[in-house]
Swiss-Prot record:
Domain of life: Eukaryota
Protein name: Uncharacterized protein YBR219C
Species of origin: Saccharomyces cerevisiae (strain ATCC 204508 / S288c)
Biological-process GO terms, alphabetical: acetyl-CoA transmembrane transport
Gene Ontology CC terms: membrane
Location(s), subcellular: Membrane
Membrane topology type: Multi-pass membrane protein
Transmembrane segments: 64-84, 101-118
Length: 127
């Protein structure tokens, strides 16, 4: 149970790391330093140097959330129409018997039990 919980935590953690990194990468910051006419524009990274070392103010020019959201939507559409839709239509075309969980095992069991039954019938006839 602990291993399952660990795998579940990993499954929910790494996508969040990727999304947050993309948001940070696509965000554009502007650092304005008071008393000078200098303005620094950067994207990604931390703006702590602007606020702590230079006593500047940080303004967000472009929020990376919207670009990341658009990228995820486009990737999702490509995945759906490129792969998932075909797979879903294939699964919908399967007969109901193939959806049963133990269908394969019950088929093998039925064939095996019939073979054993017929073998025992032939054994009785030989005696």
């Amino acid at each position: 149970m602990t291993l399952l919980n660990t795998l579940s935590n990993f499954g929910g953690t790494w996508p969040r790391l990727i999304i947050m990194s993309m948001i940070n990468y696509f965000t554009v910051y502007q650092c304005t330093i008071p008393g000078t006419n200098k303005v620094y524009v950067t994207h990604g990274g931390s703006m702590q140097a602007c606020t702590e070392l230079l006593n500047g103010t940080v303004t967000i020019l472009r929020d990376g959330y919207y670009i990341t959201n658009l990228i995820c939507i486009v990737v999702g559409l490509f995945l759906y129409f490129g792969y998932l839709k075909r797979k879903i239509l294939h699964l919908q075309s399967l007969p109901i018997s193939s959806w049963r969980f133990f269908h394969f095992f019950f088929t093998i069991l039925a064939v095996t039990s019939r073979a054993i039954y017929y073998k025992s019938q032939n054994w009785r006839r030989e005696c």
